[in-house]
């Protein structure tokens, strides 16, 4: 099985929704490398499951970065640009303007630019995690030619 690097981010109003999604999918997520912004990562690391009467914390291996507004979104964006993130699950609150909306915009732009699997809602996240390509050893993400073309442009 291919081990993916998955970034998990949620705005305050959607953190519990992401925690529920992670709880539901803990059996899959526990086999991958997880990264999250500060508080979101703390909540995910505290997810408790009971197997054979024993409490377990299957996602406590998550790597916590800074909180989104203090640089966590940019840390994840840098990881995307460096090819270190395969999937971004970002449950964003689109009903309010975030104080760090420029960081959020930059993060979503990089996810699109570098062609990573990217979900902003539970339905899309469900589609990604249940796709046969999700942990297919033979599948390779294609980096758009436009990136190489831009890097090699004549000035």
Name what the model sees in each region:
Residues 68-109:
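Mid-chain, well-packed structural core segment of small domains
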């Amino acid at each position: 099985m291919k081990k993916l690097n998955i970034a998990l981010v949620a705005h305050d109003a959607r953190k519990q929704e992401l925690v529920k999604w992670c709880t539901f999918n803990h059996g899959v997520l526990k086999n991958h490398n997880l990264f999250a912004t500060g508080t979101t990562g703390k909540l995910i690391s505290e997810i408790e499951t009971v197997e054979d009467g024993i409490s377990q914390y299957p996602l406590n291996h998550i790597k916590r970065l800074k909180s989104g507004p203090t640089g966590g979104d940019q840390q994840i964006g840098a990881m995307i640009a460096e090819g270190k993130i395969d999937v971004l699950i970002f449950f964003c609150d689109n009903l309010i303007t975030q104080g760090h909306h420029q960081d959020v915009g930059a993060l979503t732009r990089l996810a699109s630019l570098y062609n990573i699997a990217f979900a902003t809602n539970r339905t899309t996240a469900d589609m990604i995690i249940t796709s046969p390509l999700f942990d297919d050893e033979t599948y390779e993400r294609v980096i758009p030619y436009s990136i190489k073309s831009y890097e090699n442009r004549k000035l």
